[in-house]
From Swiss-Prot:
Source organism: Arabidopsis thaliana (Mouse-ear cress)
Gene this protein is translated from: MSL6
Compositional bias (Polar residues): 155-168
Residue intervals passing through the bilayer: 242-262, 283-303, 323-343, 360-380, 615-635, 651-671
PTM sites of type Phosphoserine: S211, S462
Name of protein: Mechanosensitive ion channel protein 6
Keyword Repeat included in the entry's annotation: no
Keywords: Ion channel, Ion transport, Membrane, Phosphoprotein, Transmembrane, Transmembrane helix, Transport
Annotated GO CC locations: plant-type vacuole; plasma membrane; plasmodesma
Pfam families for the chain: MS_channel_2nd
Major site of localization recorded for this protein: membrane
Amino acid sequence: MAVDAADRREVIVKIDGENGNNNGVSGETVGKIWRDGSYDFWTDGEGNLNKGHNAAAVDSDRSAATTGEQQKDEGFEFRRGEDPPTKLIGQFLHKQQASGEICLDMDLGMDELQSRGLTPVSESPRVSTKRDPVGRRDSRSNTNNNDDGEVVKCSGNNAPIQRSSSTLLKMRTRSRLSDPPTPQLPPQTADMKSGRIPKSGQMKSGFFGKSPKTQGEEEEDDPFAAEDLPEEYRKDKLSLWIVLEWLSLILIIAGFVCTLAIPSLRKKKLWELQLWKWESMVLVLICGRLVSSWIVKIVVFFIERNFLLRKRVLYFVYGVRKAVQNCLWLGLVLLAWHFLFDEKVAKAANTKALRVVTKIFVCLLVGFLLWLVKTLLVKVLASSFHMSTYFDRIQESLFTQYVIETLSGPPLIEIQKNEEEEERISVEVKKFQNPGGVEIQSGAQKSPMKTGKSPFLSHVLSNGGGGGGENKGITIDSLHKLNPKNVSAWKMKRLMNIIRNGSLTTLDEQLQDPSLDDDKGNQIRSEFEAKLAARKIFHNVAKPGSKFIYANDIMRFLPDDEALKTLSLFEGASETNRISKSSLKNWVVNAFRERRALALTLNDTKTAVNRLHKMVNIVVGIIILVIWLIILGITSTKFLVVMSSQVVVVAFIFGNMCKIVFESIIYLFVIHPFDVGDRCEIDGVQMVVEEMNILTTVFLRFDNQKVVYPNSLLWTKSIGNYYRSPDMGDGIEFSIHITTPAEKIILIKQRITSYIEGKKDHWYPAPMIVFKDMESLNSVRIAVWPTHRMNHQDMGEKWARRSQLVEEIAKICRELDIEYRLYPLDINVRNLPTSTALPVSDRLPPNWSAPASGSN
């Protein structure tokens, strides 16, 4: 059959449940079938299409010449013979046709099913079914009589690629401060019962990592004695290089002793230098690094004995000990080289070679010294910056984490008191049961414990599983003792790792398999999950049927001092001594937001410090290279002139960039006006900090538009930070008529004040209400200036509270019959001018007809 290559038509697959007759395919269109995917239509063994209740018929477009001709039923297929996935899909289609179902899911990401060179028609990867009674485009005639059949439009597998690209685009443009998609609520959430505790098994959680101490063991008062030093520094690592150094030390010392003991070897000279001096030089060169490590360990040992030095200096000593070790080693080599080679030997030997070797040793020593100073400065500046900026926020966040997990678990304090009471009663019973009146010492007698402490409360805050070294957890008692003055650099680094790598979790009262480490179900990863956690905590802590959580309820879970501190964290709880559901929900949601923003801030700060470290490495490397050239004498006057001219050109090109980089670094690490998640106001526009970099800062505007500001530009602008502001005020203004009675005005003030003082968790008492201004001698503007018990970081909550206050003011005005009215105005008519004095016009609109001359 002749095939027209230029004729590209469309094939429509129709599923007809009533008519099993199949129309043939025109010979002119067999050679060029337009399709959008790789489909395998089920045929029988002879190539004909299967006929049944749901037979697939192919209705192709025909040209005007083929009018009314019906060809024989011929089956056709476009099949990939060697394609197993396509074959499986064909079998699946056949089974669905046999069962009467039409439900195809082509959301497969297989490369074998990609139709190359064809563009997808629909973005949806699923097969859609709809009726198409009308002819498709390019259809000149349609000979199929079954136009009411269902048309299955099969889209190819390029659609998943297009959808995945759009998904990646959404992931790339999604804000880091936004929540993941909110899941649907479970049909029934099992609330926790506070009165039960499992009899056995292990309760695991995401941030109670390591096992607590034994119940009888008391914690040390000094939390810095052992846990400040990471595990990697407590044990010496035995490497191959150290083994070779020890073997070389033993062999060289043995050779050195033999040389000095044997007279012939002692007098032997090599290159006008005695043999034992050469051996000493080799000993210092090979084993000097080992000796320098001993010196460093001795210094570290004496520093560890001093409490103040251990907290402040030891971190930096361990941080630069490799550089110090290398400097000591090269210093020993340079001293040995200088004193072993005297002037006679230098004259007898090649003087130029000795000088070059000496200069090389000096260059290496200077390079290591500069690198040591650079490393020490970067570590000191980074540590002091983190301590002064983030310590308070980290401590508060970890305490919040501890409170959330403790309140979501069993009531440990109540359980401990019940056990102590049962133990006391059992002792009394045994005392009365003893006929002689002699007290029997029993192993079950209560062991002495510190007041206010609980063996259950030796909680360990961790980043999800404990571990050693920098990931080791920290006890809550140690956290309370920390402050910016006594916290060590290692402790600060560990706290930062807990925040960066951990997350808020809840401790569900359920038994978990100790062999499983699946705590992700209890992690709070969105505001929706934070609200669910707040609901669980409320049902776990509050008494059955109660609408509030009282101080006594919290004291069942926490010691008295921690319970009072926890109570002060909630809005209005300090005055009422109770916590409502809304305040608990807001507190947990705000705790999640704060934890997320703090983790992002620490991540951005770490990235900025690492990039700054790389920049400093480049600068110090260039300085070391220039110093080496000067020491080695490679530079000459001509070379310096050429280099100076190049430096001038580079300074002209990159001078402004260097200035911008320097200003950005000072702005980010010294001024530091904001952190990630802070709501700021720049040029009258409120924005939230999305990301901090060395050169730029990314903000999110109120409509979620990302705005990138260069830090050098922010240097010149005034920035208002809502997050760092104290509790902020607000203002509401309204106008009343000047004739409003004074009694009503006094009543308005009293009712507004009573409403604000009744909302103790939202407003401070005694708002200021003043007559602000007078308008047109007929109205008075009254201003109400209350003060929120929050700053305006959460702008949505601020407007919600203000809206409630405005609604209350409107309600008060309506109840007091104070409404907006236009009072009558006095109009004095003195004298009306005569009609002759008024201007008279004979002009009429164009569609009006002029009156007759005789009409009045």
